[in-house]
């Protein structure tokens, strides 16, 4: 936490405590990205590469009142507890803000748990993250997520619908 701009992955989300971490500068061709700072944010290092781009500004937004329509994209990052974060989005006004941004044509990207939060519902039948068996999502995507006993992380391949090229990750 003592050295700035050394461009290595942060150890934990301590670095995201600041409101703005981007190295980019606002200009006419700048891509301005807002990231909702979820209480259980994870995989936030996925965004660090964007912060290093000179024509990209990444702002971590802690409260829904911090949001404005100046953003080219809003990102919901990964979450360690999507069940709790879904409730937090509703309680803090983020759900309304994000829904309005989507209705107005705003671009929204969900990464991992953030993608799950954009769906209709999240089920937790075995209580992995919560005593609640299900919570409503943002209802912006027609998906339902069911949390199961064992988490499996693996590389997948597919075809990009826009250009028919093979992708993997």
Predicted segments with their positions:
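C-terminal lobe/tail of nucleotide-utilizing enzymes
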Residues: 1-59, 64-72, 125, 140-169
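Phosphate-binding active sites in nucleotide-utilizing proteins
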Residues: 32-113, 117-120
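Cysteine-nucleophile active-site neighborhood
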Residues: 79-169
